[in-house]
């Protein structure tokens, strides 16, 4: 008796590692090291860079000054308009 192709193929595909060539193992190791070092150095840059202001030293940013200047400018403009209306 001869086995059908379906039975032969199912017997061959029982293990996923059997389909993976041994030459690929160094590639996987190198890619793992590259991804791990990329994550490490990115974290180190974000966490310890003194010139990068993400969370720390937020008061050094000029954003509050710019936003407050716009608010003060609008308030001053509204006061001038009210004074002109009162003069009429």
Swiss-Prot record:
It is found in: Membrane. One of its GO terms (biological process) is negative regulation of protein-containing complex assembly. This is UPF0495 protein DEHA2C16280g. The chain crosses the membrane at residues 25-47. InterPro entries: B12D (IPR010530). One of its GO terms (cellular component) is membrane. Keywords: Membrane, Transmembrane, Transmembrane helix. It comes from Debaryomyces hansenii (strain ATCC 36239 / CBS 767 / BCRC 21394 / JCM 1990 / NBRC 0083 / IGC 2968) (Yeast). Belongs to the UPF0495 family. It is a single-pass membrane protein. Disulfide bonds: none annotated. Its main location: membrane. The keyword 4Fe-4S does not apply.
